[in-house]
Swiss-Prot record:
This is Bifunctional protein FolD. One of its GO terms (cellular component) is cytosol. It comes from Methanosarcina mazei (strain ATCC BAA-159 / DSM 3647 / Goe1 / Go1 / JCM 11833 / OCM 88) (Methanosarcina frisia). The gene is folD. CDD domains: NAD_bind_m-THF_DH_Cyclohyd. Its EC number is 1.5.1.5, 3.5.4.9. NADP(+) binds at residues 171-173, 196, 237. Catalyzes the oxidation of 5,10-methylenetetrahydrofolate to 5,10-methenyltetrahydrofolate and then the hydrolysis of 5,10-methenyltetrahydrofolate to 10-formyltetrahydrofolate. HAMAP family: THF_DHG_CYH. Homodimer. NCBIfam families: PRK14176.1. It catalyses: (6R)-5,10-methylene-5,6,7,8-tetrahydrofolate + NADP(+) = (6R)-5,10-methenyltetrahydrofolate + NADPH; (6R)-5,10-methenyltetrahydrofolate + H2O = (6R)-10-formyltetrahydrofolate + H(+).
Amino acid sequence: MLDESYESRIIDGKVLAQQVEEEVRSGVEDLESNRGITPGLATILVGDDPASKMYVRLKHRACERVGIRAEDFLLPADSTQEELLALIDSLNNNKDVHGILLQLPLPEHFSPQEAMEAISPAKDADGFHPYNMGKLMIGDEGLVPCTPHGVIRALEEYNVPVKGKNAVIVGHSNVVGKPMAAMLLNRNASVSVCHIFTDDLKKYTLGADILVVAAGVKHLIKADMVKEGAVIFDVGITKEEDGVYGDVDFENVIKKASLITPVPGGVGPLTVAMLMKHVLMCAEKSL
């Protein structure tokens, strides 16, 4: 059981997500009343993976809360890459669809990179298209990956100084690690990117003022690996029979952190909320 004295150190992703959703709802209402446009999100799901279905449902519920029109496009698992690309092309040309989300992972015979590159950069709600990634690398942040965007929002809301601080990212994926590094560099942090193969990971994490962990390894980060007062974002998630765990040993690390996200209820809700914000951005830019 967590000591009540530590509760003020928890970054409540659900509360932050509600704030973002309220902003999006207001923006959606403005678009509808002033321009007669309802932002629309198309979600593409290939196959019947239970986890993917659950994630799509979560996103559709968020759409309902903010007034975004969501439509699901289902393809059987034995569909071809060509059929997927044809669907994406039709959605690119559908003026009622402002954002497109391709739910990953895809069945093994698909090329996810080719499919993501087929999505119009203007409708790339996930922020994964190389065009949008390239803009991020030169400091032009528009449609960026949702999880790093959520982390930045949390840093801003909690007034965490970033400029000149040591930021360490554990994980170098295209979804979190690499864009997270770019966004922190854009704010003049001194950034180190590590991963599960890094020699002496502890040497790096001990120096982190801001630590973002997205390695997908249960309790990879222990209390002796972080310094007093660090701000920690746990992006990892591991599901086991007895519960859901993050990459950070939360109950022990919170005793040293100044701020920390829990799993669940931390970065996850913020990620979905930022997706809603991106769909609104896509709709506004389509005018």
